[in-house]
Amino acid sequence: MRRERWDSLRLLTPNWQSRLPGYRYEGVDPDGFMTVNDVIEFVTRFAAVAGAPVRTHTPVTSVRQTDEGYQLATRSGEIRCRSVVLASGACNLPNVPAVSEAVPASIPCCTALGYRNPDQLPAGGVLIVGASATGVQLADEIHRSGRHVTLSVGEHVRLPRTYRDRDVLWWMDASGVWNQRYDQIDDLTRARRLPSPQLVGTPERTTLDINALSAAGVEIVGRLAAVRDGRALFSGGLRNQFALADLKMNRLLDTFDDWADSHVHDPDVGPPERFEPTRAPASSRLNLDLRSGEICSIIWASGFRPDYSWLDVPVVDRKGHLRHDGGVVDAPGLYALGLPVLRRRKSTFIHGAEDDARDLIDHLARYLAGGTFRQGAVDSGRATGRES
């Protein structure tokens, strides 16, 4: 589980945002970005500082309800408890589109979970499907290895790495955007399905977007719509996708500017700025012959999904998502943490866990104390409708 990402991966969030209850990053590079090994060390140290009774090498194979609460089966034995917090996250399995089944068997395919570095790929061109954080990072890395890369782009979230001389995630944090609560969001279901922003964590704080990749020589095509008779068919809506992503980015930058007008008095913060619109290719290919030898491998960077195959409690909807209201699951004594927009927009990030956990503790404590309250209501006066 610790090695299910590519070798060069770094967090999208700067080190100063890596904080958990009673523990935070205190190294010499607060504006840097943690590697996978850094994250492992950070979490391991937190567990030691917190004195948490962590059981390593103890995978849970099932959770089921009993009259007294819950029974967990693990490879190290059985655990019985009154309450369970599900913190397994939302990125357990690769989300591979159904069109993958029509790809010619002669073309090796892998997902972002299986990819480690360019050396594992066969020589020749690479098609990467998906242009969120994972897709753009892999496209950049593989292109730098000397291969021709074709990047298939669908809906995406464009962000600059820095804005007005500050990391863009500083703005998300300071302006309160990340603290927006789930019951204040108009379309919560859509917010929970948004792809990760096009960001990369590098010492140079590089902005990695479609324009940067195009300028480097990566070929940009539309969303992969189908594979028929050995040909990949791409949608022709690139300009619309780019215009929508640019519009949403500029609206967010407007939000930052409005907040800064009344809250920021630091001379080190630069003036408002706007970025060049995403450049659409003069003519992008609508189809690609996968049998021509031009594409020698495909990487599915099309997102992830949760895995609840081990959860023997009827709280998962037909799409595989947990039914919960702000982390209070549709079963007494069952809770969740670490899911997209669980209680705030920052819920999936390391520093988002503390506030969410604090909100749920009171509900959990009252449940264990035998208090009478409706499952699903964390705070009075707040929304209690369940959202999956």
List each language-model region with its residue ranges.
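Flavin (primarily FAD) cofactor-binding/catalytic cores of flavoenzymes
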Residues: 32-388
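Conserved N-terminal glycine-rich FAD pyrophosphate-binding loop of Rossmann-like flavoproteins
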Residues: 1-24, 28, 158-179
